[in-house]
Amino acid sequence: FHNALDDDIEMSDEELFHQSSAFIETLQLVYSWNPELFELSRAGSLSQIWSMYYQRILGANSVLDYLEDVSGTVEEKASVRAQAYTLRAFYYFNLVNLFGGPYNHDKSAAGVPLKLTSDLTDGFDTRATVSEVYDRILKDLDEAEKNFAVLSEKQQKSMGYRINLPAMQLLRARVCLHMENMEGAAKYARKVIDDWGYELYDMSGKVDTLYVNYMTLDNPETIWMYGSPDDVTSMLALSATMND
């Protein structure tokens, strides 16, 4: 999701007029830490987020269930398996943070249902605990790391819209950070910084340009790209609805 609640924001000098002052007022909620950030009466998108992630988890589960039944080299299957495990961990990480509590607040609190196969079973009648969801995330990332190790360095850093090893390491660092495992967070963040040659995107001189498009593969910070512009803005549209 879009990182709105931080101080990494700079406004251009260009005057911007919008046809609706209400639109501007609603967006102020996102950038002012307003307690009414979410107006649940209009939060139909929350159910869409839930179903969207579980649809993608179904895709990852299907890959893992049937991968051995298809042809392919050891390296090709390892690549696909590594991507599926990383993506499933990514989806569950987002789900448990959206619909569960903070990891170190109450590990026994309700998290989200863990669906680990593509079988057509209910599986949604019980929510796993926050601790159980994080345990599964770490297990999936362990499996992903093992499978990435089979690949060449070039294959590990495949660019474009396929998950890669540095993206998995970045996700692992973020998971560790949410668990307040600072040693693990630093370990995997350092791997991303030291091992892959990514550079910071130079935005100096762009402050006068409205709507700088930094979400491109040409951005030297880009590790992995996915989704569409709608995915970036959908949570803003949901979050910025203002109460009457």
Please place each PLM-identified region on the residue numbering:
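Acidic, glycine-rich segments characteristic of secretory precursors and extracytoplasmic regions
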Residues: 1-13
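Structural signature of alpha-solenoid helical repeat junctions
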Residues: 73-80, 133, 157-160, 164
